[in-house]
């Protein structure tokens, strides 16, 4: 199961910087995770100041 980013995302970019497989990119209004690339490491959730990345 991959992670997804909730609407509480503040677009700070902390998650994208920590993703070892570059699965996170800036979307139209917030960052998004490519579920096919995500390896479920949890780095994004660990660094997010608002807890936006959650496991699907």
From Swiss-Prot:
It comes from the Bacteria. Its cofactor is [4Fe-4S] cluster. [4Fe-4S] cluster 1 binds at residues 9, 12, 15, 48. Binds 2 [4Fe-4S] clusters. Gene3D superfamilies: 3.30.70.20. Keywords: 4Fe-4S, Electron transport, Iron, Iron-sulfur, Metal-binding, Repeat, Transport. GO terms for cellular component: cytoplasm. [4Fe-4S] cluster 2 binds at residues 19, 38, 41, 44. Pfam families: Fer4_7. GO terms for molecular function: 4 iron, 4 sulfur cluster binding; electron transfer activity; metal ion binding. Residues 2-28, 29-56 form the 4Fe-4S ferredoxin-type domain. Ferredoxins are iron-sulfur proteins that transfer electrons in a wide variety of metabolic reactions. This is Ferredoxin. The lineage of its organism: Bacteria, Bacillati, Bacillota, Clostridia, Eubacteriales. The gene is fer.
